[in-house]
Amino acid sequence: MPTIQQLIRTERSKVQKKTKSPALKQCPQRRGVCTRVYTTTPKKPNSALRKVARVRLTSGFEVTAYIPGIGHNLQEHSVVLIRGGRVKDLPGVRYHIIRGTLDATGVKDRKQGRSKYGTKRPK
């Protein structure tokens, strides 16, 4: 416990909050170009082939982003929009690709939760 004199001499320092998505540079989304599209396997109790892409952002960072939904049309040089949000069972994947914008098409035949996958309302 500091004395009043110690507090006068040097005030209490604020605790700095560390961002979980530094590559976005305080923006809600960032545009980028896919440099590599591939599949990877998740951490231990889970088993799958998760679709991910290595993306070079306009902020200068190169990050790994998850491609949500079933099926995608992304390949090298595709222009995509990135949002924050990690994938719990993929270490190092801290970003999501937004479906239905730029070169990433929406998920086909999606009926529920369409807004998250960029799918238009079926007629």
Swiss-Prot record:
Pfam families, per the entry: Ribosom_S12_S23
Start and end residues of each stretch annotated as Disordered: 1-28, 104-123
One GO CC annotation: small ribosomal subunit
GO molecular function: rRNA binding; structural constituent of ribosome; tRNA binding
Ranges annotated as biased composition (Basic residues): 113-123
UniProt-listed GO biological process terms: translation
Keywords (A to Z) from UniProt: Methylation, Ribonucleoprotein, Ribosomal protein, RNA-binding, rRNA-binding, tRNA-binding
InterPro entries: NA-bd_OB-fold (IPR012340), Ribosomal_uS12 (IPR006032), Ribosomal_uS12_bac (IPR005679)
Residues modified as 3-methylthioaspartic acid: D89
Database matches in NCBIfam families: rpsL_bact
Function: With S4 and S5 plays an important role in translational accuracy. Interacts with and stabilizes bases of the 16S rRNA that are involved in tRNA selection in the A site and with the mRNA backbone. Located at the interface of the 30S and 50S subunits, it traverses the body of the 30S subunit contacting proteins on the other side and probably holding the rRNA structure together. The combined cluster of proteins S8, S12 and S17 appears to hold together the shoulder and platform of the 30S subunit.
Record family assignment: Belongs to the universal ribosomal protein uS12 family.
Quaternary organization: Part of the 30S ribosomal subunit. Contacts proteins S8 and S17. May interact with IF1 in the 30S initiation complex.
Name of protein: Small ribosomal subunit protein uS12
Organism: Gloeothece citriformis (strain PCC 7424)
